[in-house]
Amino acid sequence: IYGCEAYLVDDLQDLVVNSRNQSLEDAYVVFDLETTGFSTVANKIIEIGAVKVVNGKITDKFSTFVNPEVPIPYRIEQLTIINHNMVLDAPTIEEILPKFLAFSEGCVMVARNASFDMGLIEANCKGQGIEKEFTIVDTVALARVLMPQLNRFKLDTVAKAVGVSLENHHRAVDDAACTAEIFVKFVKMLADRD
């Protein structure tokens, strides 16, 4: 229909994937990836940012560029402000992934659009012969449940709605820290519902 804007929402999307009876009272890692594009099959990771949260507080950070070993498309440079020179001397995903997995060992993994970011992590694990199972929480799915009045669930929109500051948008560790603050508020909102 001309002039109509529509959104397809999977109402059956899981909030938690592969639950192993872990608790959010345990440590969890909120992470974000910047990539060369929007495909978990064809694109590469160029930055990993993560924060570890214990008792509702950020206790540790993990942040690194990743050399994708392919050129970064111009549109991605414009979006992330990450260019080829910034990643040229960075370690490759083969070097970084084991360090990221060690950082997040035993933690629930939390991400925005978790199927995309975890898809890339899982694909890289598979490519390196690493067998790993993750408990995954998607903050976008959670936002849809807790804040159905929002028309959009982009990071900046949700951050503004819950009163969280977002600085250096599209830089992985800053987006992860913002997502962590949002998630802490979501956990409180869920507790208040009980």
Language model: regions and residue ranges:
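Acidic, divalent-metal-coordinating active-site segment for phosphoryl/phosphodiester hydrolysis
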Residues: R171-V184
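Acidic two-metal-ion nuclease catalytic site recognized across multiple nuclease folds
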Residues: I182-D194
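Phosphodiester-processing cores and adjacent nucleic acid-binding clamps
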Residues: I1-V29, I136, R144
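Conserved non-catalytic scaffold segment of RNase H-like nuclease domains
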Residues: L24-F134, P148-H170
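Short, glycine/acidic-enriched loop or turn micro-motifs at the edges of active sites
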Residues: T35-G37, A141, C178
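A generic structural signal for short hydrophobic patches within well-formed alpha-helices
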Residues: I121, L142-A143
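Conserved RecA-like helicase motor core of SF1/SF2 enzymes
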Residues: C125, D138-A141
